[in-house]
From Swiss-Prot:
Residues at which FMN binds: 19, 43-44, 121, 159, 185, 211, 237-238, 259-260
Family (UniProt): Belongs to the dihydroorotate dehydrogenase family. Type 1 subfamily.
Gene3D superfamilies linked: Aldolase class I (3.20.20.70)
Taxonomy, superkingdom: Archaea
Gene: pyrD
Catalytic activity: (S)-dihydroorotate + NAD(+) = orotate + NADH + H(+)
GO terms of molecular function: dihydroorotate dehydrogenase (NAD+) activity
Record-given protein name: Dihydroorotate dehydrogenase B (NAD(+)), catalytic subunit
Pathway(s) annotated for this protein in UniProt: Pyrimidine metabolism; UMP biosynthesis via de novo pathway; orotate from (S)-dihydroorotate (NAD(+) route): step 1/1
Length: 299
């Protein structure tokens, strides 16, 4: 009932662990799957090891988180050494980031043996020179996606920033370059200030906002992208309940990524949401989750 097929890859359900603030060891990826995730996305991997920013890197708010982790990762060589020893019985999407199209392509070439698909982090809002600074311009999105598609036969997903006037332009550029899908949204630019210290709370000052507060923004982005593109859209942003998940599916998302809810509530959210979607489908008379994808686009 919940199984979906994306880019020729089978997922037991449309719920995928998002790349983000949860540490991504192989054992934690397995735990996410045991707790109900249909697939996983790794931490974003770059050319060199990065320790990330000094604490504090996360601010908890009533309706989500602001984070500025600084893209901490072991670098591609250490990541490859660790993950090539592992065998996973579920889809593993490897997230990569770089400062140029050539760096993205290099990483895709090197990490192909441990990836079922690649997600291109074109949208991190707080790491200077990476992510959003590249991904805000459609021409840059096109160049990065094309460079990666030229060197790998693995499916390529472009992760898009919401910090633009029209996210559809980014999606269309990714599609034109040959992307197999897009994921949206990454976090929204944000800041939190300590009123007694009279300074920003995060060590980096600025961060990315995620969680329930961004859901309506994310839902609109998914709706717009699904209305405009012929490739699958993976919905991300504030999905916390099964009702949230159903909204994204109706808006045209072919699959969903969940991150902040895992940080706040634990891996059990995957099973809770999957069970809720199943109940909804039965109550509404559907035999497959595929039957409800995009229904709200037809109104």
């Amino acid at each position: 009932m919940l199984e979906v097929n994306l880019f020729g890859i089978k997922f037991k359900n449309p719920l995928i662990l998002a790349s983000g603030v949860v540490d991504m060891t192989p054992e934690l990826l397995r735990r996410a799957h045991r707790e109900g995730a249909g697939g996983v996305v790794t931490k974003s991997i770059g050319m060199e090891p990065r320790k990330g920013y000094e604490n504090p890197t996360i601010v908890e708010l009533p309706y989500g988180l602001i984070n500025a982790m600084g893209l901490p990762n072991p670098g591609w060589e250490a990541f490859l050494e660790e993950f090539r020893k592992e065998k996973f019985d579920f889809p593993v999407i490897v997230s990569i980031f770089g400062g140029t199209p050539e760096e993205f392509a290099f990483l895709a070439e090197k990490l192909g043996e441990v990836a079922d698909a690649f997600e291109l982090n074109l949208s991190c809002p707080h790491a200077k020179g990476y992510g959003m600074e590249i991904g805000q311009k459609p021409e840059n999105v096109y160049e990065v996606v094309k460079a990666v598609k030229d060197v790998t036969d693995k499916p390529v997903i472009a992760k898009l920033t919401p910090n633009v006037s029209d996210i559809r332009e980014l999606g269309l550029a990714a599609e034109k370059a040959g992307a197999d899908g897009v994921s949206a949204i990454n976090t929204v630019k944000a800041i939190a200030i300590d009123i007694y210290a009279k300074r920003p709370i995060l060590s980096n000052k600025f961060g990315g906002y995620s969680g329930p507060g961004v859901k309506p923004i994310a839902l609109r982005a998914v709706y717009d992208l699904a209305s405009s593109l012929d490739i699958p859209v993976i919905g991300i942003g504030g999905i916390t309940t099964w009702q949230d998940a159903v909204e994204f599916l109706l808006a045209g998302a072919s699959a969903l990524q969940i991150g902040t809810a895992v940080y706040l509530r634990g891996f059990s959210v995957f099973r809770e949401i999957a069970e809720g979607i199943s109940r909804y489908l039965k109550e509404e008379g559907y035999s497959s989750v595929k039957e409800i994808i995009g229904l709200a686009l037809k109104v």
